Amino acid sequence: MMRQGGVMVGARKRWITDWWPNRLNLKILRQNLQNPYGEDYDYVEEVENLDIDAVIRDLKELMRSSQDWWPADFGHYGPLFIRLAWHSAGSYRIFDGRGGARDGSIRFPPRINWPDNINLDKAIRLLWPIKKKYGRKLSWADLIILAGTVAMEDMGVKLFGFALGREDIFEPDESPDWGPEEEMLTAKRGEKEELERPFAATEMGLIYVNPEGPGGNPDPLGSAQEIRVAFRRMGMNDEETVALIAGGHAFGKCHGAGPADYLGPDPSSSPIEMQGLGWKYNYGKGKGSDTFTSGLEVTWSPTPTKFGINYLRILFTYEWELEKSPAGKNQWVAKDAPEIIPDAHDPNKKHRPRMLTADLALRFDPEFSKIARRFLENPEEFEKAFAIAWYKLTHRDMGPKDCYIGKYVPEETFVWQDPLPRRDYELVDEKDVEELKRRILASGLSLSQLVYFAWASASTYRNSDRRGGANGARIRLKPMSVWEVNHPEELKKVIAAYEKIQQEFNEGAKGSEKRISIADLIVLGGIAAVEEAARRAGFSVKVPFIPGRVDAQQEHVDEEFYRVIEPFADGFRNYFRYPERINERDVYTTPEYFLVDKANLLTLTVPEMVVLIGGMRALGANYSHSDYGVLTERPGVLSNDFFVNLLDMSVEWRAADDYRYTFEGYDRKSGELRWRATRVDLILGHHDELRAVAEVYGCDDAKEKFVKDFAAVCAKVMHLDRFDLWRSNRKLYKEITAGLR
């Protein structure tokens, strides 16, 4: 380390997280807040004016125009673009809806640097002329998926459909937990069925599984088990899994022309003159026939730029023996087979058929094999299954079909799109809304019940894949109706009360087409409770409410999905199922970590999260009706008492259980027990940044601000999933979901 001109040279700046790595990180509540296109930029409006057919023509021309700086395998970039699209979409996992293709985050670390994504930086650069031409009208996120989809069509796949509507982010998304490992291609996340949540990939830096087999062991049956778990965790069943693998491996090849020792660093670690490209391969030409990606050298089909059943035919025709690739990786070669596989760059060369361990899994696993053989015998069924599975893979994080844009959106709707019935009645007006609020408040339901179940319905929304939310009132249907956190028996009584109000209103609207849904009533109940609690605090507040939600039926519910996403933590309701797992030396095991995680899924900022906690506690909207965090003598009054008492230095807090999940607050002078709270409550007074916001709401002059802010954030959460508005009245949707921004 040297000092030059008063400046320390060679010293690395230390960030707060370097010094205090276990400090609760709130960064994910303030990422991607700015768009370089400006505040008025609306991608939906832009992409609706895109000439998609012109883009498709340009893509097809590009795919057949091999570039010297990165030559196309078999003279066609289609397989490379399919891999790019697949790896963009394929990082999606069902547990939290993160990953996937909807925001173009494959362009950023860590995903662009994963070993499984080697040379996809080249694929993105090849697409730059298209992006440059269409600019603000075409996002990278849409272009990447469109390129892979057009490639399939150009190589013979009869597509099922395609939708535009994916909006780019402009910085890395740091919300996903990709795993605890410190090195790429290692695993500390459990195995097979014991793979920890929320992970789907088996190793750090992979999309799914190690293609050599579990941990590099060439075991086809073991690979099948890992494949099944990984694909299920991204929402795919066995048939979809086989279709995707068999269809995807109809195209292109793997690359392992030489030793891995010659491979340069990833894009983020490469020198500045590389301009964001990485993986420079200093072996032979370093491209074309001398390319390294996975280290495996496999071309699956004799027709690698034409869709068909040749992959399956080859897989089941030959017997296979283990060999090493030129890079020393485990792969399989067909015994006594002729050289029928074309070379990617030399038309005069042929190769014997080869497969990956992950390919042999489709042959030797009994269930996979049964499906694969059926596809082999029924090519048309296979093509349709693959087209639908590809559509699902590339669209399942986009949300309901209201979010789909463009002329190629198919008519058919699937349960994974959270479908809803069409509304066939007139909406209530403002006068009706006020009357319904009056009836709800007179129904015998408490304010805490009204808020609790409105939150229970709406807060299932997650912006990661735009699923869940209050529209549809799925809370009254299985499996949400039996979630532990939703108080199943109490929920039945609450729904019954709403059904009575609904029936009386709808029957009383004779001569009119006006109707009210249970979904609207649940939200309206929460809003009525907030307004009444504000009135009790001495303030008049009007919480925005836009009717138009409809009621889903059981056939509209993706039951497997909603079983998987049952929450084990909801800090807003002071619910945490696993206090025994808390380790204070590991923030990722704590309920406060999961509070921030849920706040991110709800698109909340730090102040929005803080004010919501304070309001929910003031209203007593706690799991099991507990008094944890209800730091007020007047629950049901929308006061800032929670913050006042949390910040009160006359109270001393002590752990109340061995897990250090619950705490008791004692008067420092008298020793009298005054309050009880959880870690979620106390973190707002302990964490410096959260305390800074809590102090804003704990001031004497903050009572009205607290009420107004809580009302605004409640309105935001209750309307996040209103994609009917998102499409039909974007200005209104943006206003009502603006929260405190």
From Swiss-Prot:
This is Catalase-peroxidase. InterPro entries: Catalase_peroxidase (IPR000763), Haem_peroxidase (IPR002016), Haem_peroxidase_sf (IPR010255), Peroxidases_AS (IPR019794), Peroxidases_heam-ligand_BS (IPR019793). CDD domains: catalase_peroxidase_1, catalase_peroxidase_2. Its cofactor is heme b. Belongs to the peroxidase family. Peroxidase/catalase subfamily. The keyword Oxidoreductase applies. Heme b binds at H249. Coiled coil: none annotated. PROSITE patterns: PEROXIDASE_1, PEROXIDASE_2, PEROXIDASE_4. It catalyses: H2O2 + AH2 = A + 2 H2O; 2 H2O2 = O2 + 2 H2O. Bifunctional enzyme with both catalase and broad-spectrum peroxidase activity. Also displays NADH oxidase, INH lyase and isonicotinoyl-NAD synthase activities. Homodimer or homotetramer. Formation of the three residue Trp-Tyr-Met cross-link is important for the catalase, but not the peroxidase activity of the enzyme. One of its GO terms (cellular component) is cytosol.
